[in-house]
């Protein structure tokens, strides 16, 4: 379970990004934050994976205050698809997909199976696994960003405008 308890985020100059939110999500729930630009959606997700910390309040995962969890360890437990894709340009598509499983010490053979399963999931040819991000279209890169977040089978997956770079035909299929 994820809980936001009276969580607020203030930036310099008094700008309020998130103001006293109280939310609770049970395991297995699919939640969407919908709002205008600047309404705190991204900030809320960034607080959940400790890319930024709340100014006030607590965020709990399974009853544990995330401020007491090492941020690197916390992030290894959370899949995250960011707005601007975020693929590592010096790594192949295979290496990008299995980045977190590698950090989690998953054996190479199993990582290769994961990469193949994930690229099949987004209906891209397996030959693309040995290419680099700059050799793929923006929509293809976005799909790789999504499956990278799924590759380690984490309990929490955060998606911040995950389909922003997809063309409407791909997005609707």
What kind of region is each of these model predictions?
Residues 109-127:
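Conserved ABC ATPase "signature" region
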Residues 132-136, 140:
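Conserved ABC ATPase signature
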Residues 134, 152, 158-159:
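Conserved signature/switch motifs of ABC ATPase nucleotide-binding domains
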């Amino acid at each position: 379970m994820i809980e936001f308890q009276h969580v607020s985020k203030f930036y310099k100059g008094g700008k309020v990004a998130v103001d006293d939110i109280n939310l609770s999500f049970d395991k297995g729930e699919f939640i969407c934050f919908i709002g205008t630009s600047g309404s705190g959606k991204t900030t809320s997700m960034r607080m959940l994976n400790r890319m930024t910390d709340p100014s006030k309040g607590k965020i709990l995962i399974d009853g544990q205050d995330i401020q007491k969890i090492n941020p690197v360890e916390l992030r290894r437990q959370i899949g995250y698809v960011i707005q601007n894709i975020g693929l590592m340009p010096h790594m192949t598509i295979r290496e990008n997909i299995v980045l977190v499983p590698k950090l989690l010490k998953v054996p190479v053979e199993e990582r290769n199976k994961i990469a193949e399963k994930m690229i099949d999931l987004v209906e891209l040819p397996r030959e693309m696994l040995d290419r680099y991000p700059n050799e793929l279209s923006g929509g293809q890169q976005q799909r790789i960003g999504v499956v990278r977040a799924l590759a380690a089978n984490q309990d929490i997956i955060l998606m911040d405008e995950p389909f922003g770079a997809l063309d409407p035909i791909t997005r609707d299929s």
